[in-house]
Each structure stands twice: as structure tokens, then as C-alpha cells.
């Protein structure tokens, strides 16, 4: 957090701190602990390479996750266009779940708000939703 507030002048939201204080110790340690952290700039560079030129970028609400990451890229990157995706490649899992009737509960139990577990569960649910759409012949299988 220090490199984000001191180097990049990012702010800390009191509501977010309060929300995190109500989470499980395991989730809090994973998110805020000092277990192998890398600086924000390095993290965003790694994530940029992973996301670059993807056909789709999925997030749990296109108006939050992607917006937060785009803001961090703009603050930390030296690239003229630091965002690794185009706006038309952003996909919202909530919309997919709504039209297919699946939910996060279909992804199995995880420790709430542990980032890797949340991402894995969301990916499982996206796959289940796509399977429903393919079986209903509403979308073609990916090539």
C-alpha cells in the first residue's frame, strides 16, 4: 500500500478499509499481508502482458474491476496507451450469469474475498454459463 500512496499518490477509501476489517483473517492476510508482495508498477506490467490482445477480458462488473485496473495502469505506466484491452473486449460476468441463470454459488465454496479463489470460482461459473449457452445453441463453441 505504501508504494501506492507515496509514489503514485493513490488514495485509501475509509469505506474500503472498514469493509476489509470485516473480512476473514485469511482473506485479510492474503490481501494486506507482506507475503511476497511486489511493487504496484511491476504487478501492473505483469498483468499488462497477460491481458494484452486478449479476445475478451472478464470482470465481475465492468464498471468496477476494469476501471480500477485502468486507473492503476495510467498512474504507473510509461506507455502512451497503458491499457492492454479495447473497450469492446470487456465482458461482465454479472450479465452472463443473469441471462443463463447461473450464480457464484455454482462455482463451489471458497474463502470469501481471497483473490485467487474468487477468480477461480468466477472462471468456473463463466464456463458453466457458456456451456448452457452452447447447449442451447445460442453461441458457437470457441475455436
Segments predicted by a language model, with ranges:
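Acidic, Mg2+-coordinating catalytic module of metal-dependent nucleases/exonucleases
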Residues: 56-63, 67-68, 104-143
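Pocket-edge positions in alpha/beta enzyme catalytic cores
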Residues: 35, 88, 111-114
Amino acid at each position: 500500500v505504501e508504494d501506492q500512496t507515496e509514489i503514485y499518490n493513490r488514495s485509501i477509501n475509509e469505506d474500503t478499509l472498514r469493509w476489509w476489517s470485516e473480512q476473514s483473517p485469511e482473506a485479510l492476510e492474503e490481501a494486506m499481508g507482506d507475503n511476497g508482495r511486489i511493487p504496484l508498477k511491476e504487478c501492473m506490467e505483469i498483468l499488462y502482458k497477460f491481458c494484452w490482445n486478449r479476445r475478451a477480458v472478464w470482470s465481475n462488473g465492468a464498471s468496477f474491476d476494469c476501471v480500477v485496473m485502468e486507473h492503476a495502469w495510467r498512474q504507473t505506466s510509461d506507455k502512451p496507451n497503458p491499457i492492454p484491452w479495447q473497450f469492446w473486449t470487456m465482458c461482465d460476468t454479472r450479465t452472463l450469469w443473469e441471462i443463463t441463470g447461473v450464480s457464484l454459488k455454482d462455482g463451489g465454496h471458497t474463502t470469501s474475498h481471497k483473490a485467487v479463489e474468487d477468480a477461480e470460482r468466477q472462471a468456473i461459473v463463466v464456463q458453466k454459463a457458456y456451456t448452457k449457452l452452447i447447449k442451447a445453441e445460442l453461441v458457437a463453441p470457441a475455436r
